[in-house]
């Protein structure tokens, strides 16, 4: 009977040890440790910190210098940060590392036990560095928050990213978009130049400046065969961008983004309305003084009917009429003390100045033209010529100036009506040539600058921006890359 109990006990102990080995192996796999011979000898939890003790079984070592057998000089425990399983806890690996010494008294060579998952003298596993780098893809994450997440210093997180990540320029596609983004890092980096692949939306590159002394050596360094393959260059109405076609892309045609053309006339109308607001505010101020009022720093002059309507409802003039939701039901206006609907506000604006209706109607003609001829540049050319003739003879100086603008950029505007096929999440679709995608990309650059509360290192900003906004960034992990040489030249 006793023999049976001993056998059963031995079986239970053996089964328990087998389970523990399997359990330890699963934990090491879960921790993603590269050294398969490592075992977990202990686990403890102290507050919000988990401690896992790792060690290897002793094995025979021979001196790499003389070939004599080496003896262990004992164990040294290293604290290693390994940011896996961070479910509200900090995870610390207690790594028991042996030190070996050659038994030959004439040699005395010593070495420390090495591990593949952590480098010598490092307090973080190799996986930590890769996870830190991956965290920089989130534009909403600051370097400080990333460092806090992985229990490292801000400096370590930034140095790790800069050490491993070097982003090269992407190849040019046959449709390229260019635009500037305001960074204002220093006297050399005020407006950076964003270059984008129109098909994929990925940023091709980010240049420190849009000035000639930056762009000229940069584009000249790109092989001519690659630049000759560009068919369309999309930009706003900034003349140096349009001149890129003749200087750098000999086979391309310039495309002026339709959004910027519409923004030009909207800005002019808005400035006209603001001038009206200033006029009525000045009138109200003079009436207040003439009626015995005293002007000081505490004086508040209530907004007149004209100022109120022009300030709060000028969007009825500026917004595309097709996108305005007109409501017929009357609602009490607390400032005017009357029941009003959208049509009433519109009529009230036109009664203040009938020119506002003329401006709105002339603006709507261009909005409708811009929306109706996508994919049909030939008919767009005919309609644009008719619009130019209408604006030139309308008697309104704002639209006469607009007609001059349309004449100056006539062919570039027509090119924006070309449609091309793009691949999206839902499959293939037709898209009009526009700078819309690059405007969205610029907002990400501005958000990154704001989140970092200002940047002073352009190379780090460039690398972070490209790494975070490309779909599948390829890390060029080399110490240096070939920078662009900038020359002291003024813009043309």
What positions do the PLM features span?
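Short, conserved DNA-binding cores of transcription-related domains
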Residues: 2-110, 114-115
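Short, positively charged, Gly/Tyr-enriched micro-motifs
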Residues: 2-13, 81-187, 227-228
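RNase H-like nuclease fold core
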Residues: 3, 9, 159-232, 237-244
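Acidic/histidine-rich catalytic cores and adjacent linkers
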Residues: 4-7, 56, 60, 71, ...
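Short, conserved catalytic/metal-binding motifs centered on acidic residues
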Residues: 52, 63, 102, 146, ...
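Gly/Ser/Thr-rich loops at beta-strand to alpha-helix junctions
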Residues: 151-154, 236-241, 260
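Short, surface-exposed amphipathic charged segments that create phosphate/polyanion-binding patches used
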Residues: 190-193, 266-278
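Inter-helix linker motif
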Residues: 251-267
